[in-house]
Each structure stands twice: as structure tokens, then as C-alpha cells.
């Protein structure tokens, strides 16, 4: 990218309006430009015919619409798409699209790698490099919309849902993720409703509180264990933010919208967290929580120590939760033949750091930059 030019994908509508005013342009031009970029899917300013030649020339001199580069695309036997996207820094991230009869869900990454080191997740094994910019996050949506369009041009409505469940912990890239989600929900851009944009977090409590105040999106929590002892092993951030604090926040997260529920994701690991006593502990943990539970069959990756629970074990676990009034769904595994399923996204991370260094890096970034700190079925985000 030309360092002298501004990447317009980093701007939401109000920011774009302010930018054009600063460039001595009429404010209404922002709506036209915003729609050209996100609704129509045009990058070439010369093709934005209603902007006027003078403005088009100015945009060519001052601005750009830079995107990650698609370096590989795989399509699963079940129709799932996975794109490997190369960033300007040379790192790669992955984005996944899951088609279903009445909707299409895009799984979007928020970081290059991940710092949280969940033991059952392939992304964690890649180390952590950096946060994605707003442009790199919304660029995944832009590219997927283009690739999925019938004529490989005008953006259509094949993407009906977006889940921030790709590589990284979204809440450790708070400002950029919220900015990108706001663009997703803008009627002048992608027009997704608040119930069709879901953020999945491992439980970064201060940022969960912030998110609750500033964004109406759906919330999913990567729970995966019913006790602190087990969750400390599977999801190490639990040592900092234990279950008692996490569940307390989840109980009141949608207090002003009593019909909305927090989704709890629970990967089923053979002999680890899938026994009847674990189900009983989970029932007790979620008592009086407005919750639904997604049971996720574990998706293996190279050198993992874990195995997937049997179908019979998963069904028995689900039935026990349902018997006690907890709405529970077993997630259908999609894209596992191309390593696009939940927990399998890895990308390609350069300059990988150790676990302790990752935390130090995030801690430093959070002090200096406010912006620091998979597959899914149709029933899960309705």
C-alpha cells in the first residue's frame, strides 16, 4: 500500500463523512462512496460514475482500497469454502464460508495467530504476531462477498451471517473488531442485523463489559469446561478470569433484552470433558443463566493430544442438558476435510512468539494502543 494514501476500508460511514469534509467535499458524497465500496464491491474510483471526475481524481491521489491477497482457495465436499489470505506484512490468515439452505455464514479472523493458547485449538499452536486492522477484518467480508457473487462483481446477499470465530481472540483487538462489525451492520454497507453478527470470546471480562456497552451483537463464550480446574487446563485465560466471574457477567449480559441468550460453546473431548459428571456440573454452572449450549465435536489437527467424543457420548450429554431445560444443539461439523472446521484454522504466522512473550506483547500494546485490547450451524446464531 502507498504509505501516503489512506485505506478507505478502515473508515466507517461517519468517519468517511468526516474525511470527505476535511477534503472540502460535500458530506453526501460519503454515502455514495461507502455504497460503492461495500454494497457494489468496487475498488476502482474511475468506475464510481456518480462521484464526478474531480472527486474521482482526488480519491485516486489521496486514497486506496487495499485488501488482503487471496493466495489459495479450497472448497469442501459439503460446499464450505476456505480462503488463505496474505497480508501486507507477509503473514497469512484464514477465512471460512459455510453455506446452508437458507443462509450463508462467514467465519472471520481478528488476529494473526492467537495469544490465549487454548490447548485444543490449532490457531494457538501458531503463536501470536499482531492484531488485524479494521481494513483487514472487513476486507475478509469484502473479498468473500466478491468471490461468492454470481458474476464475481456486484456484492449480493449470499453472506447472511458473520461470526468472529476465526483466528485470534476478538476482544484483544477491541476497537478494530467493533469498528468492522459496525460496518457489517450498516445498512449502507452489508446491512446485517445485530442478531446475525456474533462475537466469540474465551472470556476477556473487562472487554466483555465494554462490548456490552457499545455493541449489540450476539455473544458466544468459549466455555469448554464446567469447572475451574479443567478450564484452567483447556482455556488458560480462566486463571485470570475464573468461571464465577465469567458466569456472573453472562447472567446480566442481556439484562435489558430478556429474550436474548448467551451462547456457550463446548468442544467435546473424549474422556476429558464429556462424561456424565461433567454434564451435571455444567447444568449446575448454567443454572439461571439465559443460555444455549453448542456442543462441538472436536476437530483434530496434527500432533494434538485429544480425540473426538463418540456420537453416542455427545448425544447422551446433549440429552441430559436438554432434560434439565438447557437449550442444546450439537454443531454439525463442516469443512473438516479442508481443515476449515472449528479449531482447525491455522494460517501462517511469521515471527511467532512464545506464550509468555505473547502476553507481554498484548500487555504492552494495551497500554499504548486502545485497539489492542468454526464452522457454525444455522440454529446457533438465529
Curated annotation (Swiss-Prot):
Domain Radical SAM core residue range list: 100-336
- Reported cofactor(s): [4Fe-4S] cluster
Question: Per its record, how is this protein called by name?
Answer: Dual-specificity RNA methyltransferase RlmN
GO function terms (MF aspect): 4 iron, 4 sulfur cluster binding; metal ion binding; rRNA (adenine(2503)-C2-)-methyltransferase activity; rRNA binding; tRNA (adenine(37)-C2)-methyltransferase activity; tRNA binding
> Catalytic residues per the record?
94, 342
- One Gene Ontology CC term in the entry: cytoplasm
Q: Which reaction does it catalyse?
A: adenosine(2503) in 23S rRNA + 2 reduced [2Fe-2S]-[ferredoxin] + 2 S-adenosyl-L-methionine = 2-methyladenosine(2503) in 23S rRNA + 5'-deoxyadenosine + L-methionine + 2 oxidized [2Fe-2S]-[ferredoxin] + S-adenosyl-L-homocysteine; adenosine(37) in tRNA + 2 reduced [2Fe-2S]-[ferredoxin] + 2 S-adenosyl-L-methionine = 2-methyladenosine(37) in tRNA + 5'-deoxyadenosine + L-methionine + 2 oxidized [2Fe-2S]-[ferredoxin] + S-adenosyl-L-homocysteine
Record note on cofactor: Binds 1 [4Fe-4S] cluster. The cluster is coordinated with 3 cysteines and an exchangeable S-adenosyl-L-methionine.
Alphabetized InterPro entries for the sequence: Aldolase_TIM, Methyltransferase_A, RlmN_N, RNA_MTrfase_RlmN, rRNA_lsu_MTrfase_RlmN/Cfr, rSAM
